[in-house]
Amino acid sequence: MPAYRSRTTTHGRNMAGARGLWRATGMKDSDFGKPIIAVVNSFTQFVPGHVHLKDLGQLVAREIEAAGGVAKEFNTIAVDDGIAMGHDGMLYSLPSREIIADSVEYMVNAHCADAMVCISNCDKITPGMLMAALRLNIPAVFVSGGPMEAGKVVLHGKTHALDLVDAMVAAADDKVSDEDVQIIERSACPTCGSCSGMFTANSMNCLTEALGLSLPGNGSTLATHADRKRLFVEAGHLIVDLARRYYEQEDERVLPRNIATKQAFENAMALDIAMGGSTNTVLHILAAAYEGEIDFTMDDIDRLSRKVPCLSKVAPAKADVHMEDVHRAGGIMSILGELDKGGLINRDCPTVHAETLGDAIDRWDITRTSSDTVRKFFRAAPGGIPTQVAFSQEARWDELDTDRENGVIRSVEHPFSKDGGLAVLKGNIALDGCIVKTAGVDESILKFSGPARVFESQDAAVKGILANEIKAGDVVVIRYEGPKGGPGMQEMLYPTSYLKSKGLGKACALITDGRFSGGTSGLSIGHVSPEAANGGTIGLVREGDMIDIDIPNRTISLRVDEAELAARRTEQDAKGWKPVEQRKRRVTTALKAYAAFATSADRGAVRDLGDR
């Protein structure tokens, strides 16, 4: 029987000093011997997705204590990608994922915690904590802060549902008045919570449901709704049960690596493809699999993308649909339910809350459940009142959206498209692959060819787009923005938003070794691997070269013959794989350390220390 890890610091004469320190935190004689549960919070006043988490760690802690455990809370950092967007702050976003994973490992291992509840929400926090959970492999439950309500605004007599991206696009559109921009800005992000579309934060929180590490509703229940409190309460009780099952009953099935198996990762990726999740999820899923020593690669993603259809389109792919609408249609368990009906998931994978994912779907899919409680849960609606307070409203939809032919969630017989919402492309410009969110690509440009317009940084591309240098039919190439070349692999939300504001969202393509915000739509192809800084072919593209993109056939090619590419490579080797001109970018010691070990995106941009 495995001993509680915490006994290392709580038992034995020689641990008198450690016990003295534990007593100073409030522990009593009766607490020594109970499981010590780390409550891994990520509260910060910088991020709307985390601003309401301050008291939620203690809510979970009280439930842990009530269930017979000892709760100890600490915080990780949390970067707001939206606020960090469009300037050098974005260099820090992806590297923060590794810092978060490391900080969780440091705290949990230094203090010998037995298990943990991870309170995450936004873009890099859920992935960082997920990486830590699989690295540590102790009982863990995830509960996120929940999505923001969609903004609502009346413009020129018409009601619009809004999100962050609408504010960015409007601000760059000369045809939108200053007054209207102000109205949109003030309405786009009305409440606490992760931004309201199927952006990176919400995508990742949905995927934790499919991985089996969070409770049903984790990805879709609004941050403001009273129903979300139940998830935090239940997580506190559940983690104590999981800890006891492992340490007292030798039940290894409750460990993260035995829940989030390769089959579970396939389920998560199938969900991601079906719901058109953020392309960032590919990075994070690959990184989490790496930490769990799970053989899950771009080839697996490519295989799944060829057979899983697109069953849901949410903003930015469908501007008037947000997470509150997905919840009303049954949330993630109902998307998984439709995939299950099509034989596209592994039903036998265990979860933290049910014996198998199949059992969970049978109870929580609104099209098959007999539970009135479940049906009421998914009628949780937005309150429509701006607030930064969690659980502050109890609004309900009058009825659920169970329309699987024309509703927010479709059946496999009536998909938005037979091809899924994400695709892996390969070709001479991306020998190790690249990613496109097909759910956000207009059907008219699934096949596209055009001349390259080459930029050596995001800043240069933005300047060119705003100066009207880009024309319909162009392929914008932004390079040296990968994990190593950036460093930090910046998101390209501003370039894609500005293309949309110029009316080029369906008339141009953009490819990069950087990445995209979950708010990006259009023919935006990221994660080109190998990246330019690693000698990737994207570093050999020249102004005017023709690039051919064929999403149905999963190819992307630079129309330059091999002899010419070889000559260019020899020339570039001599010059060094770096931007032609010095960029006005302060690369600090912290960023240099990340760049020194960062891999290309096809490996999840994880650190390669040469030990695997």
From Swiss-Prot:
Per the annotation, how and in what number is the cofactor bound? Binds 1 [2Fe-2S] cluster per subunit. This cluster acts as a Lewis acid cofactor.
Catalytic reaction list = (2R)-2,3-dihydroxy-3-methylbutanoate = 3-methyl-2-oxobutanoate + H2O; (2R,3R)-2,3-dihydroxy-3-methylpentanoate = (S)-3-methyl-2-oxopentanoate + H2O
Give the lineage. Bacteria, Pseudomonadati, Pseudomonadota, Alphaproteobacteria, Hyphomicrobiales
- Name this polypeptide is given: Dihydroxy-acid dehydratase
EC numbers on record = 4.2.1.9
Q: Which residues form the active site?
A: S517
The chain residues annotated with the modification N6-carboxylysine are: K124
UniProt lists the gene as ilvD
Q: From which organism does this entry originate? A: Rhizobium meliloti (strain 1021)
Q: In which pathway does it act?
A: Amino-acid biosynthesis; L-isoleucine biosynthesis; L-isoleucine from 2-oxobutanoate: step 3/4; Amino-acid biosynthesis; L-valine biosynthesis; L-valine from pyruvate: step 3/4
